[in-house]
UniProtKB/Swiss-Prot annotation:
InterPro entries xrefs: Acetyl_CoA_COase_a_su, ClpP/crotonase-like_dom_sf, COA_CT_C
Domain of life assignment: Bacteria
Protein location: Cytoplasm
Main location: cytoplasm
Record's protein name: Acetyl-coenzyme A carboxylase carboxyl transferase subunit alpha
Catalytic activity: N(6)-carboxybiotinyl-L-lysyl-[protein] + acetyl-CoA = N(6)-biotinyl-L-lysyl-[protein] + malonyl-CoA
Pathway where it operates: Lipid metabolism; malonyl-CoA biosynthesis; malonyl-CoA from acetyl-CoA: step 1/1
GO CC annotations, alphabetized: acetyl-CoA carboxylase complex
Molecular functions (GO terms): acetyl-CoA carboxylase activity; ATP binding; carboxyl- or carbamoyltransferase activity
SUBUNIT field: Acetyl-CoA carboxylase is a heterohexamer composed of biotin carboxyl carrier protein (AccB), biotin carboxylase (AccC) and two subunits each of ACCase subunit alpha (AccA) and ACCase subunit beta (AccD).
Domain CoA carboxyltransferase C-terminal: 35-296
Alphabetical list of PANTHER family matching this protein: ACETYL-COENZYME A CARBOXYLASE CARBOXYL TRANSFERASE SUBUNIT ALPHA, ACETYL-COENZYME A CARBOXYLASE CARBOXYL TRANSFERASE SUBUNIT ALPHA, CHLOROPLASTIC
Source organism: Escherichia coli O1:K1 / APEC
PROSITE patterns: COA_CT_CTER (PS50989)
Taxonomic path: Bacteria, Pseudomonadati, Pseudomonadota, Gammaproteobacteria, Enterobacterales
Amino acid sequence: MSLNFLDFEQPIAELEAKIDSLTAVSRQDEKLDINIDEEVHRLREKSVELTRKIFADLGAWQIAQLARHPQRPYTLDYVRLAFDEFDELAGDRAYADDKAIVGGIARLDGRPVMIIGHQKGRETKEKIRRNFGMPAPEGYRKALRLMQMAERFKMPIITFIDTPGAYPGVGAEERGQSEAIARNLREMSRLGVPVVCTVIGEGGSGGALAIGVGDKVNMLQYSTYSVISPEGCASILWKSADKAPLAAEAMGIIAPRLKELKLIDSIIPEPLGGAHRNPEAMAASLKAQLLTDLADLDVLSTEDLKNRRYQRLMSYGYA
C-alpha cells in the first residue's frame, strides 16, 4: 500500500518518489551499468533521517492532521493485530445497531476481555455506513450494554477512542444523544471491573468521553483529545477556520500537554512517521501497554477500583 503524505511531509514524499522511481527502473532492466541498489540505500537512509528531523518538532496542528490520517489504524485493525478470537456483538436492544461503534468479546494473551471502540471506515461506502466514526445514541447504548455484560461476567473492558465527535443530527438529538452520553459517563464511573481507555486517533468531545471514563487512560503519541475540533474553536473565537493551527496550539490537545495536566496516564510511542507507517509495531506497543495496565489493576478490589475512579474524576479542574 502506497503511503499518503501530509503537507508537512512533502520533502519526505519527494524522496520516497525518487526511491520508487529508481526501484521501478531497477526491476525493468537488471542489466543497467550503474549501482542502483547503493543509491536506493542512500536515499532510504536520507528519508529516515529527514523523517526523524521533521517529526522531532511537530506542532499541535500537525499532530491533529496525523490523528486524522486516512491510513491510520482503526479499532478493528488493532483487534486483528493485538487480540485473538474476536466475536462482535451488535445492537442496543432498543432501536438499531450503530456501525460507528464496534464491540465484542476477544482474548488478550488468552484472557477474555470486552472491546469497545469507534470505527470510521476506509472507503467511501464504509465511511457512510459507519457515519465517519460519529456515533448516534444507539451506538452509546450498545456500548453501555456491552460494558454491563462485561461487568456481569467479570471481564475487563478495553475501549479505543477515535471520533470527531458524537453525531449532531436532528434524529440523534430526538433519540436522546445527550442523555445517552451522560448515562454512559455515570455508569462507567460505577463499573466494578477494570476499564482501560486508549485514544488511538481523534478524541472529540463528548463523543469520546462516552467511552472514555476509565481506571487508566492512554493516548497514542500522535493522537488528540479535546472538547472541540481546532477548526470549530477557530470558527467561534476568530470567526475563521483558517485559524485552526493557532487554536490547536492554544487548546492543549496533544498527549504531552494532557499528561502534564494529569488527564491521561500514559503516552504510547508510535513508530517513526506515525502508526500508519507500521501498524504491526504499533499494535505490539499498544498490547504491551494494555497488559501492563491490566496487571496494575488486577490487584485492586472492586471497591478500590470504584473509589479510585471517583477520586480521579473529582480531581479534574483543580490546579
